[in-house]
């Protein structure tokens, strides 16, 4: 459990740092930083699932700290949900629908790409 907590702390710290940097770099009415972080997390989880778990390269003791802890706290469903509701409340329906559609489609594609990369990795 301590490993999951440590992974969670690192993932939250990484999300905050990357999110702050992306927000300053890419100011927009669309929640692009949240989308980018969630897609990166989906790619990482796809890779870890394929390489670390399915191919057995990640020791059992590291699985939960990496997946549930780090990647789980790095990605954020709650922030994505709030971002979407705020767009709806502001009457920005097209942006809200784009956020939902793009997040789902690109997130699933990122998991798929992560797994494909994992199975091609030769180490």
Curated annotation (Swiss-Prot):
Keywords, in A-Z order: Cell membrane, Ion channel, Ion transport, Membrane, Metal-binding, Sodium, Transmembrane, Transmembrane helix, Transport
Top-rank taxon: Bacteria
Location within or outside the cell: Cell membrane
Catalytic reaction equation(s): fluoride(in) = fluoride(out)
GO process terms (BP): cellular detoxification of fluoride
Function: Fluoride-specific ion channel. Important for reducing fluoride concentration in the cell, thus reducing its toxicity.
Entry similarity comment: Belongs to the fluoride channel Fluc/FEX (TC 1.A.43) family.
Protein name as catalogued: Fluoride-specific ion channel FluC 2
Organism: Symbiobacterium thermophilum (strain DSM 24528 / JCM 14929 / IAM 14863 / T)
Gene that produces this protein: fluC2
């Amino acid at each position: 459990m301590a490993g999951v907590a440590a992974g969670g702390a690192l993932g939250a710290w990484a999300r905050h740092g990357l999110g702050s940097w992306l927000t300053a770099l890419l100011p927009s009415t669309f929640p692009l930083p949240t989308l980018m972080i969630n897609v990166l997390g989906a790619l990482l989880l796809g890779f870890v699932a394929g390489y670390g778990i399915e191919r057995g390269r990640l020791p059992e003791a590291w699985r939960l700290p990496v997946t549930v802890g780090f990647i789980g706290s790095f990605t954020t469903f709650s922030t994505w949900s709030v971002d979407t509701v705020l767009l709806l409340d502001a009457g920005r329906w097209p942006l809200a629908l784009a956020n939902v559609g793009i997040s789902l489609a690109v997130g699933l594609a990122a998991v798929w790409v992560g797994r494909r990369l994992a199975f091609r990795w030769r180490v």
